[in-house]
UniProtKB/Swiss-Prot annotation:
GO terms of biological process kind: 'de novo' UMP biosynthetic process
Name under which the protein is recorded: Dihydroorotate dehydrogenase B (NAD(+)), electron transfer subunit
Stretches assigned to the FAD-binding FR-type domain: 1-101
Lineage, broadest ranks: Bacteria, Bacillati, Bacillota, Bacilli, Bacillales
PROSITE patterns: FAD_FR (PS51384)
Amino acid sequence: MKKAHLTVQSNSEIADRIYKMVLKGELVRHLTEPGQFLHLKVSDAVTPLLRRPLSIADVNFAADEVSVIYRADGEGTRLLAGKKEGGRIDVLGPLGNGFPVRRIEPGKTALLVGGGVGVPPLQELSKRLTEKGVNVIHVLGFQSAKDVFYEQECRAYGDTYVATADGTYGEKGFVTDVIREKQLEFDVLLSCGPTPMLKALKQQYGHKEVYLSMEERMGCGIGACFACVCRTGESDTSYVKVCLDGPVFKAEEVAL
């Protein structure tokens, strides 16, 4: 983990309340594992006190640039949405453990499933997998057409299916409906998104090799505050820290 000030290259709305921010700085050279995250200080003022954890969406090592995607819902992310080109942001990272790209052999097929703001980390993951010869299929889930983003970016690396809960774009239903109806075949499943989606994927495909990136509220981002603990399922008193031990876990390692 390193601490640095990165420069805002751009910051724009790409879907309903969904923003893409591109940051530049030497810290980017250390972002080698898809699925890790950055911890951004959103203001120089006393409040908001806590940093905001944002997953790494795309890395351009040649330009020392990293893209992060976030939904401007709360006070902190609304402050981020107001950041202008040329501004500086205090960043900690990379944090956490990412997806196991090295374990997936060339020629295998990986199914990447994202829901809402869980879609961004799949972009860099897809890029890294295809670079090593892994076949990639994407299934992206959103609430409505206005929420859809990153479809074309995913299509650049492999077949991509989009589902919306209200049926206003792509297939109507949930990501699990698409996987079943399209009869998608895969060797390994990697997913990031809301807990109900991850739970459904674990229930239906837990007999296969499945990796889940957990979305939990975080305080410190380094495992000190215990705000993001998740039960392991071994017992009612056995927990892991999502920020430190995760955010990516094998499906059987966590209770959902």
